[in-house]
Amino acid sequence: MLLPINRKKFKGFKYYDKRFLNKSFDPGNKYSIPYFWGTLGIVYNDKFVKRSEVESWDQLWSSKFRDKILLVDSARDDFAFSLISMGKSVNDKRPADVQAAKAKLDALMPNVKAILDDEIVMYMVQEEAPIGITWSGEASEMIAENKHLHYVIPKEGSNIWFDNLAIPKTAKHFKAIYKFLNFMSEPKNAAQNAEYVEYSTPNKGAIKILPKSVTGDQQFYPSNKTLKNLHVYSDLGQKWTQIYNDLFLEFKMTSR
């Protein structure tokens, strides 16, 4: 599906932070170039919730949050925080663990107001709920629209995701492709792009250019300690992907 990156034609890896290279989905970055990155976490509204009340995934199950939580409509992500709350891997394929994570999600249902796709941004901005589980990219959109919203990566850890640049096998115009890839990796261009999109950049050259108000915001540029506790998703394979999806559908049908 993808062609390997030609290191003689692409000169931009030197600009990228090593913490965001050589991930399990592409050892050695043979096929991919990191474009943006982010996390899964909790958005809360400080008019109704204190930060200290949402610093752990386990706190979501508190009875005081009945009918107050919005979930992202994603089997992998919702199972991830349930598994993490039990001290398990986000890539768990042990039947007992996955079933236990499902049971724990079922127990959360009284606290779930809705399970949403992209509209979770609008719901949180309009204060339809005080808590939302979502990705950092969408969280940045929410925060830009409502000063009372904040984003937390729970202390137990979470998922770290990447948007990557890659070359499909069907590609033909390689001169233009590598010109584009090198252009996008130039620190000044990567910095401008990050400011426009409002996602976290893995480009260390861009980090030096971006204002400290951006790169110093630990909601979206967390500490090394936090980064070490973030995990990429592995491909579960067709069988286990279907198991997760089936169990998630059962969860969504759970009576409140």
Region annotations inferred by a language model:
Residues 41-48, 84-85, 161-176, 184, ...:
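A bilobed periplasmic-binding-protein/Venus flytrap-type ligand-binding module shared by bacterial periplasmic
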Residues 225-256:
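Conserved C-terminal helix/tail region of periplasmic/extracytoplasmic solute-binding proteins
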Residues 98-107, 113, 145-169:
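Periplasmic-binding protein-like
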Residues 125-126, 131-148:
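A ligand-binding cleft/hinge motif common to bilobed small-molecule-binding domains
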Residues 57, 120-123, 139, 177, ...:
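Short, hydrophobic alpha-helical packing/hinge segments within bilobed ligand-binding/sensory domains
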Residues 1-111, 116-128:
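Extracytoplasmic ligand-binding site segments that recognize negatively charged/polar headgroups
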Residues 168-228:
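Mature extracytoplasmic/periplasmic domains
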Residues 2-15, 32-33, 147-159, 168-171:
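Short beta-strand->loop
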